[in-house]
């Protein structure tokens, strides 16, 4: 999917989530090879539908901002795929982007560059694909109303601090 990142910035109830949810519907259909890759990954974590065991639609994953780095990247005693691998050949949507733990967000950098993630444990090392489109959204300030018809209660300093939660190296990758 290449290293494609979209960033949606806007006040509350603007429709950022709805726009993100529509992205998989305008992407090309999965090829047979992509479909089998996605199906294998979902099979490992027991996420296949019994009535339709082959996944034919591009994944759309939207983890909560409280997710840990290991749940996002993958891990465990017997390493399992994380959200980035479950989003392989699809979309990973991170809503309320600045609310994610900084270490969790920074953990995305290498897998995004490589299109894969390697999880090492004492007795094993496994690599899962992680070629996904990252779509992140955020409000322009902590209260979410800056720029809208509703009065923003945030100070200029709190808005600046809120926007600075996103690192420069990650912003460099955003379209």
What residues fall within each predicted segment?
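Walker A/P-loop
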Residues: 3-50, 114
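Conserved nucleotide-binding/hydrolysis micro-motifs of P-loop NTPases
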Residues: 13-15, 26-28, 42, 98-99, ...
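Conserved catalytic/switch belt of AAA+ P-loop NTPases
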Residues: 106-126
């Amino acid at each position: 999917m290449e290293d494609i990142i979209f960033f949606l910035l806007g006040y509350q109830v603007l429709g950022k989530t709805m726009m993100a949810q529509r992205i998989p519907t305008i992407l090309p259909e999965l090829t047979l090879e992509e479909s089998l890759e996605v199906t294998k990954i979902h099979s490992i974590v027991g996420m296949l539908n019994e009535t339709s065991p082959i996944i034919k639609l591009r994944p759309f994953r939207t983890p909560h901002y409280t997710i840990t780095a290991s749940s996002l990247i993958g891990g465990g005693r017997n390493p399992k795929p994380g959200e980035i691998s479950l989003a392989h050949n699809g979309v990973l949507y991170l809503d309320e982007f600045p609310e994610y733990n900084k270490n969790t967000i920074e953990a995305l950098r290498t897998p995004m560059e490589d299109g894969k993630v390697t999880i090492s444990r004492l007795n094993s090392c496994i690599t899962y694909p992680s070629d996904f489109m990252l779509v992140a959204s955020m409000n322009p300030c902590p209260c979410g109303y800056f720029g809208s018809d509703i009065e923003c209660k945030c100070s200029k300093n709190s808005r600046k601090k809120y926007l600075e939660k996103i690192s420069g190296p990650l912003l460099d990758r955003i379209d």
